[in-house]
Amino acid sequence: MVIIGILMSKERIKKTALEIVKYIHGNIKACNIPNQKKENKFFAPLVYLCQTECDKILSNTKISLLERLLKCAKIIGDLQSGNCMQQTFLAFQRLLMRLIEDKLSNFSTCIPISVMTISNHAFLIIDNDIVCDPWLNFVGDLKDYCFANMKRKEYFGIRSDWTCFTNSEVYDEDS
């Protein structure tokens, strides 16, 4: 019975993540999309503004990284622009809120979520094996992800007991 509940939860997580990814992929403008030179050039100033605002927020170490990510998500949503890292921040914020609303996370336990990076790309890993990549419009199992075999680095993560980490090993006590 527990296995069935776990499988149902994973399917609910994937469904929720897919809704979020579809929204972001369709509404948040990027400027680094392959084979879209004209659109990229048009949206570049707005994306640059969004990245600049997020960089200002992220450099403010007086507040926790979690707070900084949530503030960036607000800017990204307001400006409706951002490349893969900004889109991942927005997906993180929306997914975290939805997991709480859908009662998949509560005050004592949380579905683990990590903002991951590889060389020049960012995406989420949810519950250790579900990938949510708004820039690539992908939600699925880690084993099926195009970057599955690349070395990943955790930028920020929330564990099942709500502890927060930066860079996989550094406990972020402020978050």
List the predicted regions and their residue ranges:
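A structural boundary/capping signal
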Residues: 1-175
